[in-house]
């Protein structure tokens, strides 16, 4: 079966956390700016989209805005002069309230990303109607949580997604890791030990990677690992 190549791209503390108060420190701001510039580079160089879980999408883009079937859709279309770059939302129950079918963001790495919703069978039928009305494409897959492998096959076949950035949070990263589909890991490591957050992968089993890139930038470690086959 064919699926996209997956690179998990994250900012992480020295002790492996990806969420928590440390993300609001000056050190993390520096790490984040390196992270976002790498994301822009990946977008320019052959990646077809990024995937995040509902919580991360909500914090970054929809800001907790509820969906409403009665809302008038903003059907302003993206120019179709290039292959779309997808913002893939793993949203099992269908909770994200998008205002239109693409993201507008001041960061060109995320601006004009076409939204693709991935849902489980737990989704409310009205949410599916809401997506249709807003012309937001979707995949429904998996009983309680989303079936990662099947969803990836559909992304590959129906949406032409060949390379995908996996950008958190911990839970969705863990689902991908457990499904054994993480091919590469790209990290910006903040020079801090942090507490009260979640790890890079919430679940999974031991896996071997090899270091393919390593540099130091503004006090952070920037590195890339590829899965050992």
Regions of interest found by a model, annotated:
Residues 2-229:
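Enzymes that bind and transform nitrogen-containing heteroaromatic metabolites
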């Amino acid at each position: 079966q064919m699926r996209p190549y997956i690179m998990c791209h994250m900012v992480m503390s020295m002790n492996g956390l990806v969420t928590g108060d440390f993300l609001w420190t000056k050190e993390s701001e520096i790490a984040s700016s390196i992270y976002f510039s790498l994301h822009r580079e990946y977008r320019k160089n052959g990646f077809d989209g990024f995937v995040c879980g509902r919580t991360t999408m909500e914090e970054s883009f929809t800001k907790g805005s509820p969906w409403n079937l009665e809302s008038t859709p903003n059907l302003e279309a993206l120019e179709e002069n290039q292959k779309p770059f997808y913002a893939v939302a793993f949203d099992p129950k269908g909770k994200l309230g998008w205002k239109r079918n693409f993201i507008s963001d001041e960061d060109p790495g995320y601006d004009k990303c076409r939204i693709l919703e991935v849902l489980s069978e737990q989704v409310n039928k009205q949410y599916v109607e809401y997506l249709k009305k807003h012309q937001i494409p979707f995949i429904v897959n998996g009983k309680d949580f989303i079936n990662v492998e099947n969803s990836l096959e559909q992304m590959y076949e129906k949406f032409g997604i060949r390379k995908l950035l996996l950008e958190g949070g911990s839970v969705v990263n863990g689902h991908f890791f457990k499904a054994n589909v993480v091919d590469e890991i790209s990290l910006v490591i903040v020079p801090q030990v942090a507490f009260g957050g979640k790890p890079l992968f919430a679940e999974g089993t031991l896996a071997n990677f090899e270091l393919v890139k390593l540099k130091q930038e503004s006090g952070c470690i920037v590195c890339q690992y590829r899965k050992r086959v």
